[in-house]
């Protein structure tokens, strides 16, 4: 039985950052100030529904600001772009997340800062909704995105509300400008309960993969969001998801992302996968220190930068067929992380028989370095399972015919 190497790679990344102890817990929320600073987790989910994770992936934590893009998507789905944009603009603020950043029409600058998120929250379930009905609508929808029933940490919400003076002042100003209709306390209560929904990194990976897939749930196949809603949400995440660190993030990491002060961090590569990390210590910008390191390494190693000029492959595994004692795996397109992940998943699921396996690269256009490493590791595991492995590469798209351990693989001519 072949095994998948991706979880091993994720464990290696966690080991690389585990000794990083810089950063501080969020100290303005008592429940978060006393949280365990040590948990560390990472999870990936492809648009095909393949989930990989490592570390403390079963630990629940509150979404906090990570809830903002999902709430924005829900508001867009319910109300439409025109109604949402009448309340909240789409420009980066360049200021801290808890500033009252308004444009010339007194709209919050974007949905990723607190002012914008409070306004977005008030659009969901209609302006005449009660707090509990609105929060339940959000919780239920987030549960659909995660693929399981999520719950609210009401103890933490009460702790957060006790020190919510700044958000209350923002809500009062928004009400004064006619952006929201509810009383300021009710608006902040609703928003705070939204932030207190509990998730794991695996939940967030599935939720983000739904956005990456244009609104189709990667596990259930259910259509939850319109593709245009997902595109708008990812655009805002790219420009404003990391607050006043957004420009630096997009340049160096290149993944639409959103952070939360509980230590969560999510990222989305459109059409490919969703990523989530959890580590509670934060940098001065309010982003997880180890989470940022993990994302930078994933982006570099896996070629995930949104502005990469590498071609993106569709269905990478064209076919797996058998002729006598020989199994042929035919690949196609440009080999990047997602394409090579499809290859690895296919060989793990396939019941190989016979004595030989031939990897046919006749239709392959190019290889990203990460794909070379992943393909070579997959071939090594086929060899170690007792099969003789050959590579058919008439256009020399592979730089060499070595397995991942440095031994030579045979060429098929």
Curated annotation (Swiss-Prot):
EC number(s) given by UniProt: 3.5.1.2
**What EC class does the entry list?**
hydrolase
Give GO terms: molecular function aspect only.
glutaminase activity
Q: Which UniProt keywords apply?
A: Hydrolase
Annotated region Glutaminase: the residues are 23-307
**Gene Ontology terms describing biological process:** glutamate biosynthetic process; glutamine catabolic process
Residue ranges of domain STAS in the record: 316-413
Which Gene3D superfamilies does this UniProt record tie to the protein?
Answer: DD-peptidase/beta-lactamase superfamily, STAS domain
Reactions catalysed? L-glutamine + H2O = L-glutamate + NH4(+)
Q: Where does substrate bind?
A: 65, 114, 160, 167, 191, 243, 261
Checking NCBIfam families in the record gives:
Gln_ase, PRK00971.1-4
Subunit comment: Homotetramer.
**PANTHER family tied to this protein:** GLUTAMINASE
**Similarity annotation:** Belongs to the glutaminase family.
Q: Which HAMAP family match?
A: Glutaminase (MF_00313)
Q: What is this protein's name? A: Glutaminase
Q: Which organism is it from?
A: Corynebacterium glutamicum (strain ATCC 13032 / DSM 20300 / JCM 1318 / BCRC 11384 / CCUG 27702 / LMG 3730 / NBRC 12168 / NCIMB 10025 / NRRL B-2784 / 534)
What broad taxonomic lineage does this protein's source fall under? Answer: Bacteria, Bacillati, Actinomycetota, Actinomycetes, Mycobacteriales
Q: Which gene encodes it?
A: glsA
